[in-house]
A protein has these predicted regions:
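Glycine- and acidic-residue-biased ligand/ion/polar-headgroup-sensing regions
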Residues: 70-72, 76-82, 87
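Ligand-binding loop in jelly-roll beta-barrel domains
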Residues: 103-129
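Structural motif
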Residues: 81-83, 90, 106, 116
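Short strand-connecting beta-turns/loops that link adjacent beta-strands
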Residues: 48-50, 70, 114-115
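Short, charged/polar surface micro-motifs in flexible loops or helix N-caps
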Residues: 48-50, 58-61, 81, 125-128
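A short, N-terminal "cap"/entry segment at the start of jelly-roll beta-barrel domains
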Residues: 1-50, 64, 130-137
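Short acidic-glycine-tyrosine-enriched beta hairpin
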Residues: 88-103
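Conserved short histidine dyad/triad with adjacent acidic residue
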Residues: 38, 53-68
Length: 137
């Protein structure tokens, strides 16, 4: 007997982070926030153990150099490319690639290009509230 397929969609503002039921999540129904100068983030998953955020970074934008005491992060580039400085080393990360940042590692992500960048930030545990700003390298 074939298995039934059900649609798993959510209405805007459905609170994906707090739901125990599976459903499709996107920017359209995720919690949105602004950061930096003209940068956007959407919480696709947000719970006490894991954070998955889709972020948009316009040309020339950069975050403040910082580190996280507890959170490890993985940045996966969906489109465009970013320059990631970690521990004083610069790494160009193009679309289809990612970079892992371990807890305690000073880092900064920048978009030095003339095109916008979309990327995922996966943090475990979540990095919000676990950020310590540091001077530029």
């Amino acid at each position: 007997m074939p298995k039934r397929t059900k649609s798993v969609t959510a209405k805007a503002g459905a609170g994906a982070a707090n739901s125990n039921q599976p459903f499709a999540i996107s920017r359209e129904n995720a919690e949105h926030y602004r950061w930096g100068v003209d940068c956007d983030g959407w919480h696709l998953v947000r719970d006490k153990n894991l954070s998955v955020i889709e972020e948009f970074m316009p040309p020339g934008a950069a975050e403040i150099r910082h580190y996280h005491e507890h959170a490890q992060q993985f940045f996966y580039i969906l489109s465009g490319e970013v320059l990631v400085e970690a521990n004083g080393e610069n790494t160009l990360v193009p679309a289809g690639s990612g970079i892992r940042i371990l807890p305690g590692t000073p880092h900064q992500i920048r978009n030095p290009t003339s095109s916008a960048v979309h990327f995922l930030v996966i943090s475990q545990p979540p990095s919000h509230g676990d950020r310590i700003d540091v001077p530029p390298a």
